[in-house]
Regions:
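N-terminal helical cap/lid subdomain that shapes the substrate entry/recognition surface
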Residues: 4-112, 134
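Substrate-recognition/cap helix-loop segment adjacent to the acidic, metal-dependent catalytic center
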Residues: 40, 91-95, 115-151
Length: 151
């Protein structure tokens, strides 16, 4: 037990990613995309659509980083990714529709256990988000009102 206590005593801050760690992206975005895709007459699986969206988003984020480009906002990469996936799936869209789908990211809910877990951690450690998070998403949905965000 001494080793565990030594490790706990050495922790100075807890850092984690926002998307997929704090908030349930797959479920939330699938719930948001399903009615849109159905209204467009798309017969595919909304969960697969969201997986393509998220994978494309990740790939675009990595390409920006690897090419040492200026920072591209999470929202902008989201717009590019959704438009690409809609195009790939043969779904006609408008830029407003793309914006509406991406805006759902700001309304994602945390995984059920997250608010209590963060509250417990925050009593003992400073919490940080190491992410290209949209700051309003963190404040609104995480249950934590004071945090430091590092991008």
């Amino acid at each position: 037990m001494a080793q565990v206590n030594d490790v706990r005593a050495s922790i100075q801050v807890c850092m984690f990613d926002q998307y997929g760690t704090v908030v349930d992206m797959q479920t939330g975005l699938t719930e948001a995309a399903a009615p849109y895709l159905a209204a467009k007459g798309w017969k595919g699986d909304p969960n697969s659509f969201v997986t393509w969206w998220r994978r494309t988003h990740f790939e675009n984020s990595m390409i920006d980083a690897l090419l040492h480009r200026e920072h591209t906002s999470y929202r902008e990469i989201g717009h590019r990714s959704v438009a690409f996936v809609l195009e790939r799936a043969g779904i006609p869209y408008t830029l407003d529709e793309v914006g509406d789908l991406v805006a759902h990211i700001e309304r994602l809910r945390p995984f059920p256990e997250v608010p209590e877990a963060l509250a417990r951690l925050q009593r003992r450690y400073p919490l940080m988000v190491l992410s290209n998070v949209i700051p309003t998403c963190w404040k609104r949905r995480s249950g934590i009102t004071e945090f430091r965000s590092t991008v």
